[in-house]
Amino acid sequence: MLHRLVRHILQPEGVFYTMLLHRKSVELLAPAGTWEAMTAGIAAGADAVYLGGKHFNMRLHEGDFNFDDARLKNAVDYAHAHNVELYITLNNLISNEELPALREYLAYLNEIRPDAILVQDFAVLELVHEMGITVPLHTSVMMNTHNEHAIEKLKEYGITRIVVGREMTLSELALFRARTGIEVEYFMHGDMCISESGQCIHSGVLFGQSGNRGRCMKICRWPFALIDEETGAVLDADSPGPYKLALKDMCMYRSIPALIQAGVYSFKIEGRMRSPEFIARLVSTYRKAIDAYIADPNGYTTDEEGWRTLYDNRVRDYTTTFAFGQPTAVDIGMTGEREPRFFSQAVEEAGFADEVLRAERPMEKENAPSRHLSVRVGTVDAARAAVDAGADTVYVGGEAFRPNRPWKLTDYEDLVRYAAGRARVVVNTPRTTMRRECGELEQFFAALNDIGVDGIMVGNLGTLKLARTLTKLPVQADHSFNIFNHLAITFLKENGLTMATASYELSFQQLRQIVENAVLPVEAVIHGAYESMICDYNFPAMSLPNYSDLAAPELLDRLYAFRDEAGGVHSIRIDQYGRNHIYFAKDLCLYPYLEKFSGLGSYRIEAQDYTADVTAEIVRIYRAALDRLAAGGDGYRAAEFDRLTEIAPRPLGIGTYRFRQSRNSI
């Protein structure tokens, strides 16, 4: 008989509860990309397996992997016959043209009765409710769930388990678990992304193959040089290697007690593309360790033979990433020596290769507003410049990139007075809102009610819930919501939002389909510097021996960048929370094609990385072009386009609009 451990966890209100730790207190969750891998994982001791169909999941590169519909049913039956649960991944973004197939697939999954479906796209939540689907729902890690307010919102839609964001420490996770009571799944072994989940768009924009749609080309495994952006000088010549973003593989084998005591229920192994033998080895090794701890926690010690098995059969070297604190350079495989496969190599980003875009018909939307121009800025001076140049809305606040400082309450008050009668002032919020950010936002939102701003831009479900609870201001969704279809916008409207910003990864066709079917106005970015990924890592600190939070100001405020092998320079901007925002090498510019976007609810300029003077000139040019279009004329002027090119701090291009569509999920 198993010994049982009584574990006490402090609840927020100060009440203790007890949980008897036994064999079913922890789930060992194995991946399966083939029938053989599934049966091997089950035979080795997995409590549950997760796998994907031939479409709508995050592992679509290999045609020989994943399960067709008939095999899915057989897999469910096989797992249940062996008293093992089976979860099906439906965890990528779904475009409008794929929605009919999604309906059919959901109906089929409801028939074959897996134990849960893993989801990312809000459209799935909408359809599950509409269709009466009764299969339990778990959030995918791609939903980037990282605060308790998002959990409370997701519970309203029947979510019973979350795969937590990889950036959470175990101490944060324990508090998170205690406050929400939600079941927690945690990636504890395997390949990890260096970007925050769901917030890397590099592959989708560059190759038309979105990491959010199961086709990541792994730009993070490219070699890069760290440079001084202003001088071009290489700063990391003494670095162990050029693979600055190549995170090592997660391995929590030596930390199983810490995982269990943090309240993790499901121990998730990554590896749906791995062989049956590889999966069996991992599962059996972790099975023995978990069972040994549960049987006798006080007498438990790491089985070094098991560790030797994992170490000798590793793909990359191992790391615990954020489990016990901020990762450092030792967590990155900079030499690239153990990298098993390179999916792509550096190429130049798209310029104005616009044959596809020029051939498209314009958007059509009844009652579309008359050329509303919004501008996101980084400083008070840039905000005033945007107002003076003719912006209808300015987005202010949120992340502040060094050397700029965060906005103060008095800055908002002054700008509201300055813009009165000329432009709306909408407050931006950080894209990522962990415990610190949420605490700060609660106080900030309470103050906003008296300042007179015109609205709030939110970047995740938790911030949405806070804004709707603590203010009476209009709330709109930023591009970080990864809006890829009109049903996701329906979801946002049901939750009180007034406008949604489209994903950067959409092609023009896909954006047009959303705009023409959406129940809310849709905003799209038409010009500006935009981020390829956001990372909770400090890349300058990883490469520069003298760099730390206590470094000299000239080191902290220097502008850093990564240079890829194609010569592209990717700016690195560090915000007040220490996160690193990596930019594309070319800024987006859709000036020559504005007439195509006539159905938009708002045309947006991303000027957060621009000076006040550059911001003013860009806004004036777009204001004039949009006004000409509104009057029925031609918006384009060659001299204006030339001027945009001259003043741009980076080369210009059209990003994902070079593609007819982001490669599909079916």
Please identify what each model-predicted range represents.
Residues 2-29, 164:
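Generic start-of-chain signal for non-secretory N-termini
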Residues 2-6, 271, 585:
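Short, intrinsically disordered low-complexity segments
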Residues 17-145, 172-266, 273-491, 495, ...:
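Active-site pocket-lining/capping segments in soluble small-molecule metabolic enzymes
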Residues 159-161, 168, 181-182, 499:
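Extended, well-folded interaction surfaces typified by the phenylalanyl-tRNA synthetase beta subunit core
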